[in-house]
């Protein structure tokens, strides 16, 4: 008996990973989703999933989403002071460090809204050196809710790295945000 499951699992070449993640993030924002926090568990600030979200900062800011990131490896010297575009479009962002080394056995994770979830490869594997396993769940409330619950538990056990950055003072013109104006 075969089971049909809505997840799309794939093995992806390391060079294509960031592009595929950026397309997944763009799909989420193209569907005019609710402005829930974007939750991210990543190996480091240099992880392709972090870069994909950083590239989407104009969209994140335009809809008023907050970004909460848990890193398995944190170099305080390399952390950004804030996420902004041209210094003029700040994003509500918090970073935490999961000091427990066992976290490296976990998988990277991105949760957007109530039904978009990406699960990446194990954080012990360097994404720059090998191909990766990943799954994409679009429109799957159960998967996203389960991932959100896991994130919140890990968040509570993690140490703050940076203070929370305040959200923008007023509405953001997405065209101006994209131009960096």
How would you name each of these model-derived features?
Residues 2-39, 43-181:
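PLD/PLD-like phosphodiesterase catalytic module centered on the HKD motif
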């Amino acid at each position: 008996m075969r089971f049909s499951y809505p997840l799309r699992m794939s093995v992806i070449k390391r060079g294509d990973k960031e592009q595929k993640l950026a397309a997944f993030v763009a799909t989420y924002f193209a569907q005019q989703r609710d402005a829930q926090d974007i939750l991210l568990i990543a190996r480091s600030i240099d992880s392709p999933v972090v870069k994909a979200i950083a590239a989407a900062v104009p969209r994140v800011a335009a809809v008023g989403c907050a970004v909460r990131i848990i890193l398995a490896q944190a170099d305080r010297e390399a952390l950004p002071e804030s996420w902004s575009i041209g210094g003029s479009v700040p994003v509500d962002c918090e970073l935490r460090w999961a000091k427990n080394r066992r976290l490296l056995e976990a998988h990277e994770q991105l949760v957007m809204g109530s039904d978009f979830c990406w699960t990446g490869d194990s954080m012990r594997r360097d994404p720059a050196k090998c191909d990766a396993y990943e799954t994409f769940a679009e429109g799957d409330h159960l998967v996203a809710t389960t991932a959100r619950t896991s994130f919140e538990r890990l968040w509570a056990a993690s140490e703050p790295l940076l203070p929370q950055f305040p959200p923008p003072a007023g509405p953001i013109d997405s065209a101006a945000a994209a131009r960096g104006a």
